[in-house]
Swiss-Prot record:
<dbReference type="InterPro" id="IPR013785">
    <property type="entry name" value="Aldolase_TIM"/>
</dbReference>
<feature type="binding site">
    <location>
        <position position="213"/>
    </location>
    <ligand>
        <name>3-dehydroquinate</name>
    </ligand>
</feature>
<comment type="function">
    <text>Involved in the third step of the chorismate pathway, which leads to the biosynthesis of aromatic amino acids. Catalyzes the cis-dehydration of 3-dehydroquinate (DHQ) and introduces the first double bond of the aromatic ring to yield 3-dehydroshikimate.</text>
</comment>
<dbReference type="GO" id="GO:0046279">
    <property type="term" value="P:3,4-dihydroxybenzoate biosynthetic process"/>
</dbReference>
<feature type="binding site">
    <location>
        <position position="82"/>
    </location>
    <ligand>
        <name>3-dehydroquinate</name>
    </ligand>
</feature>
<keyword id="KW-0704">Schiff base</keyword>
<dbReference type="InterPro" id="IPR050146">
    <property type="entry name" value="Type-I_3-dehydroquinase"/>
</dbReference>
<dbReference type="InterPro" id="IPR018508">
    <property type="entry name" value="3-dehydroquinate_DH_AS"/>
</dbReference>
<keyword id="KW-0456">Lyase</keyword>
<feature type="binding site">
    <location>
        <position position="232"/>
    </location>
    <ligand>
        <name>3-dehydroquinate</name>
    </ligand>
</feature>
<feature type="active site" description="Proton donor/acceptor">
    <location>
        <position position="143"/>
    </location>
</feature>
<feature type="binding site">
    <location>
        <position position="236"/>
    </location>
    <ligand>
        <name>3-dehydroquinate</name>
    </ligand>
</feature>
<dbReference type="GO" id="GO:0009423">
    <property type="term" value="P:chorismate biosynthetic process"/>
</dbReference>
<keyword id="KW-0057">Aromatic amino acid biosynthesis</keyword>
<feature type="binding site">
    <location>
        <begin position="46"/>
        <end position="48"/>
    </location>
    <ligand>
        <name>3-dehydroquinate</name>
    </ligand>
</feature>
<protein>
    <recommendedName>
        <fullName>3-dehydroquinate dehydratase</fullName>
        <ecNumber>4.2.1.10</ecNumber>
    </recommendedName>
</protein>
<comment type="pathway">
    <text>Metabolic intermediate biosynthesis; chorismate biosynthesis; chorismate from D-erythrose 4-phosphate and phosphoenolpyruvate: step 3/7.</text>
</comment>
Amino acid sequence: MKTVTVKDLVIGTGAPKIIVSLMAKDIARVKSEALAYREADFDILEWRVDHFADLSNVESVMAAAKILRETMPEKPLLFTFRSAKEGGEQAISTEAYIALNRAAIDSGLVDMIDLELFTGDDQVKETVAYAHAHDVKVVMSNHDFHKTPEAEEIIARLRKMQSFDADIPKIALMPQSTSDVLALLAATLEMQEQYADRPIITMSMAKTGVISRLAGEVFGSAATFGAVKKASAPGQISVNDLRTVLTILHQA
């Protein structure tokens, strides 16, 4: 299986990498939170742009991205607009969503973009090609904050992302039972052993799914999300606790 290298970080080998999400409403908060995050122990900084109020002003968005880049130049920067339908803060048109991601790619400030699988097949394929032409990696994602489908459907979605040339397929699902967590873990293992030729990221959310955020190295998930301050999704634990557990499992 091939790995994905972003800056000096190799994703897909060793212990799962820790991603943290920065969610700030304006440039002043972006700056203050970036300074606070700089001291934390994590591997990838995700900027959740859907929390940014001045979204219609591309110059303002990119000015904020520049602050993040300059504050943490060594950290890979993942640019993510999470749509309202997949648990995000704002709803925008597909056209605006694609344009925003293209602007991020053009800026030269971001290392990766998050691209939602169900944006539309043609738009997804075109945006992946555009990102790769500009040396930007793509985390292709799907989130369901209500339920967990059968393992076969989870695998089908991850394989579709891979077929669309995502650098890293990602899926996050809400369990209604412990059995749903097992379905997610079983799907992750089957995908990793039988179909994946690149790193994948999977997680089961909420308290019920916390084990999936810790056991990625066992079942085949290459990264996990932790919290520096406020969690960006239910079930996230602090980066310090997360690093401790990931290290214990890696060294066992």
